[in-house]
Amino acid sequence: LVGHDFGDAIRFAANYVEEDSPHADQAGINLDIFRTFTQGFLKPTAHALTELEIATLPLSCLVLACELSVRFLDDYLLGDPYFKINYPSHNLVRARCQIALAKDMLAKMEQMEQIVQECLHAC
């Protein structure tokens, strides 16, 4: 569960654009925010987490971005019954933004893993 909470927070807070930005091409993970959040997260929790939980924190971010992209797309295709929308293609826009974020996270996964290790050693 820790990965879900961490991943969802990063997915939402460390994206260069808002989750419903119409500019999906600008979506991506801000590694400075990722580093700062990870430092703040690990400082009080590292002692209570397993090595596997810590090692998979970056992957959890990717998983949550992928999960939300599928959920937004599914909601759009089903007529938007779950997520509140402000306009007809709102969930489609959200899905595209999350897909772009996930692609960027995948491209930066090694950097994210390195940041987690650096933050862990600084605790």
Each model region followed by its residue ranges:
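Active-site activation/catalytic loop segments of kinase-like enzymes and analogous catalytic loops
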Residues: 3-47, 63-82
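Generic alpha-helical secondary structure signal
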Residues: 28-35, 55, 89, 93-96, ...
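General structural signal for secondary-structure boundaries
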Residues: 30, 50-51, 109, 113
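All-alpha amphipathic helical-bundle segments outside canonical DNA-binding/catalytic cores
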Residues: 49-61
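ATP/Mg2+ or Mg2+-diphosphate-binding catalytic cores
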Residues: 67-123
